[in-house]
């Protein structure tokens, strides 16, 4: 487990990932119970979640500026924070596009992808919870693979949704609007995968350092 002084960073990541889960669940709720008259209020609720994530991101950056010793490389800690923050930005971006393109009803394909984004965010939170155990974890790699798999499934859903949109869409303006919404939904899954890739890269780097230490001690 990470030492107590280090827990701030890992706790921050878990908090950000939890906010991502909240945002994804809200997005799914908006789609499943869609009411055009309520979309502005829903956008404000989503922005409040995104703003809370921004605050967490800034808290971590402020801590990095003054920290003498950090549990991981500063660049890696900041990269992870930025990656998590981007997930929230993209989820909010979906609702923004539904709002400013004045979408009046939600396509069933969008609800399916939103559920997949929620799955990715939940797995991402599990990954952040497990991250402090990176030295001995037996599940960290499995969670990375799980998120990669969910992202691949989201990609396939996105392709099918875009196909349905262009085959069945009658209103050119509606097609354009939904192309943008679908793209941002797919970005959400991509960003979750990016978080997993950052974790994978950090753990790989630490493994190489751990392997090289005995060699340096032997003077090889």
Regions found by a protein language model. Give the residues of each.
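Short, charged, amphipathic alpha-helical segments
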Residues: 40-47, 74-78, 108-111, 141-146, ...
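Secondary-structure edge/capping motif, primarily at the C-terminal ends of alpha-helices
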Residues: 24-38, 60, 64-71, 94-105, ...
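A structural signal for well-ordered alpha-helices, especially hydrophobic packing surfaces
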Residues: 17, 21-31, 50, 54-57, ...
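Peripheral, non-transmembrane regulatory/ligand-interaction domains of membrane transport proteins
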Residues: 2-4, 12, 30-46, 51-54, ...
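Single conserved hydrophobic/aromatic residue that forms the stacking wall/gate
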Residues: 209-220
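Hydrophobic/aromatic-rich structural module bridging two neighboring secondary-structure elements via a short loop
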Residues: 40-41, 45-49, 59-89
